[in-house]
Amino acid sequence: MKKLLKISAISAALLSAPMMANADVLASVKPLGFIVSSIADGVTGTQVLVPAGASPHDYNLKLSDIQKVKSADLVVWIGEDIDSFLDKPISQIERKKVITIADLADVKPLLSKAHHEHFHEDGDHDHDHKHEHKHDHKHDHDHDHDHKHEHKHDHEHHDHDHHEGLTTNWHVWYSPAISKIVAQKVADKLTAQFPDKKALIAQNLSDFNRTLAEQSEKITAQLANVKDKGFYVFHDAYGYFNDAYGLKQTGYFTINPLVAPGAKTLAHIKEEIDEHKVNCLFAEPQFTPKVIESLAKNTKVNVGQLDPIGDKVTLGKNSYATFLQSTADSYMECLAK
C-alpha cells in the first residue's frame, strides 16, 4: 500500500509540477554532470540529481527531484539497469529531452562486463544495510529509442539483487571513449535546442575532446611507474579507468557497496593480498567499511581513498578532465608508497 501511495505521489508530481524558467540540463550523477557541463558551458546550466555525499546505489527521489526532471531542457542518465530510481520519471517525459547512455548504439560495443569472477559469492554477506521492499508495477516508456517496451518488477532486496545481478559494468563515466560519445550526443541535443549557440557548442565539444586527449596522455605517463602494483578497491567501479590507463586491479570487496562481504570472502581476500603482494586497499568517501580498516591492520597494507563520484570536483568546462586527474592522483598517493 505504501508503495502504491509513493508511485501515485510521483505520478502526481510529474503531472502537476510547474514548468520552471531557465531550465537546465540534468545529469543523474555528478560524473555525467562533468561531461554535460563541459559542453553546456555558456549555453545553459547543469544540475546533478544525486547530491554530494550520496550514492546512486541507494538514492531515493524527492518530489523536488521529480520537478527537476520534468522541467529540464535535457536529462542525461545511464539507464534503468543502474539509475533505477529515475525509471518512472524518465518514462513520462518526451524522449527528445532524454539521453539514455545504455541505448546509444556507439556505446554498446565499448561496454565491459562486471567482473563477478573477482568477487567470491560465499553466501555469507554481512547485511548491515538490508533493503526489504517489493516492486510490482508496469510501465511503458519510450526514451531515446524508437520502440516502447513493458516490463514488470517483482522482487525482494532490490538494491542487492539489482546491482549484484548486473552483467555489465555501468560506471561508464570512467571510460574516456564512452565519455566522448556522450559529449557528442549532448552537443547534438543542445544544438537542436539552442541553434543560435551552435558555434559555441561546437567549440565546447572540440575543447572537451582536446583537453581529454591531453589529460589522458599525462595520466598514462603519471601512472606508468605503478601499473604493475596490485590493489583492491571497495567496489567494482573503476574497470574502465584501469583499462584506459593500464592499471592492474587485483580485485574488489563487493559488487554492491550497500552489502559488506562476508567472513569467507574476507579470508580469501586476505590470502590474495599475501599471495599477490597487494600494495593498497582503496576505500570510498561515500562509505566507511570497517572491513578495509580490519584488513589493513592485519596485513600492514596501505590504505587509500578513491571517489567514483567526484564530490570535491566542481562542475565546469574542464571538470571531466579534472575528475580523471583527481582519480589518478588518488591512485598515485597510495600506490607510490
From Swiss-Prot:
<feature type="binding site">
    <location>
        <position position="307"/>
    </location>
    <ligand>
        <name>Zn(2+)</name>
    </ligand>
</feature>
<comment type="function">
    <text>Part of the ATP-binding cassette (ABC) transport system ZnuABC involved in zinc import. Binds zinc with high affinity and specificity and delivers it to the membrane permease for translocation into the cytoplasm.</text>
</comment>
<keyword id="KW-0406">Ion transport</keyword>
<feature type="compositionally biased region" description="Basic and acidic residues">
    <location>
        <begin position="119"/>
        <end position="129"/>
    </location>
</feature>
<feature type="signal peptide">
    <location>
        <begin position="1"/>
        <end position="23"/>
    </location>
</feature>
<keyword id="KW-1015">Disulfide bond</keyword>
<dbReference type="InterPro" id="IPR006127">
    <property type="entry name" value="ZnuA-like"/>
</dbReference>
<dbReference type="Pfam" id="PF01297">
    <property type="entry name" value="ZnuA"/>
</dbReference>
<comment type="similarity">
    <text>Belongs to the bacterial solute-binding protein 9 family.</text>
</comment>
<keyword id="KW-0813">Transport</keyword>
<dbReference type="GO" id="GO:0042597">
    <property type="term" value="C:periplasmic space"/>
</dbReference>
<dbReference type="GO" id="GO:0046872">
    <property type="term" value="F:metal ion binding"/>
</dbReference>
<feature type="binding site">
    <location>
        <position position="171"/>
    </location>
    <ligand>
        <name>Zn(2+)</name>
    </ligand>
</feature>
<feature type="binding site">
    <location>
        <position position="235"/>
    </location>
    <ligand>
        <name>Zn(2+)</name>
    </ligand>
</feature>
<keyword id="KW-0862">Zinc</keyword>
<feature type="region of interest" description="Disordered">
    <location>
        <begin position="119"/>
        <end position="163"/>
    </location>
</feature>
<dbReference type="InterPro" id="IPR050492">
    <property type="entry name" value="Bact_metal-bind_prot9"/>
</dbReference>
<keyword id="KW-0479">Metal-binding</keyword>
<protein>
    <recommendedName>
        <fullName>High-affinity zinc uptake system protein ZnuA</fullName>
    </recommendedName>
</protein>
<dbReference type="InterPro" id="IPR035520">
    <property type="entry name" value="ZnuA"/>
</dbReference>
<dbReference type="GO" id="GO:0006829">
    <property type="term" value="P:zinc ion transport"/>
</dbReference>
<feature type="disulfide bond">
    <location>
        <begin position="280"/>
        <end position="334"/>
    </location>
</feature>
<feature type="binding site">
    <location>
        <position position="57"/>
    </location>
    <ligand>
        <name>Zn(2+)</name>
    </ligand>
</feature>
<keyword id="KW-0864">Zinc transport</keyword>
<keyword id="KW-0574">Periplasm</keyword>
<keyword id="KW-0732">Signal</keyword>
